[in-house]
């Protein structure tokens, strides 16, 4: 199991992302804004739901299938079924680009670490691309974990900084209900 707590600032308010994950594919993501739960997505390994601004919807179709395919807590392991698309220069470094369903994942050739992902999603005006940059990797219990996530969210760029990481503690089955 793994629990990660990231914090970012948006328009002067604190945004907190709490991820709880358990093998083989249980996941809970809660985004709080100004102390209130803004968005939540939970998957118990078979079924799940999302809550956004108070509206709860069950995960169905493609969203449900994607959740079932994740191999947590190390979802990069699922990318072995992806396709090596190309080698691309990113910030002056060569990266492998893997295509996995609707996401491009960039791995630094020298370090092997994931440095970026770009997920395609449907927005109100058609397809949008959501980039996430991963950096400041530090070892925690023998596992390299990115301590900075920079995510593009429309007009805003959120700079998440890891505040807390717990491995094999503080995650229970009730977290996925």
Walk through the language-model features, giving the residues of each:
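N-terminal mature ectodomain segment of secretory-pathway/periplasmic proteins
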Residues: 1-54, 83-84
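Short, mixed charged/polar active-site loops
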Residues: 13-16, 36-40, 56, 104, ...
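Residue-level signal for well-ordered, solvent-exposed loop/turn and beta-edge residues enriched
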Residues: 36, 47-49, 55, 93, ...
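Catalytic loop of the DD-peptidase/beta-lactamase superfamily, centered on the K-T-G motif
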Residues: 37-39, 46, 56-59, 155-158, ...
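Hydrophobic, aromatic-enriched alpha-helical segments typical of multi-pass transmembrane helices
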Residues: 40, 50, 59, 84-89, ...
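Acidic/charged, solvent-exposed loop-and-adjacent secondary-structure segments enriched in E/D, K/R, S/T
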Residues: 49-75
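Short, conserved active-site entrance elements at the starts or edges of catalytic domains
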Residues: 65-91, 114-116
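Gly/Pro-enriched, hydrophobic low-complexity segments
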Residues: 93-176
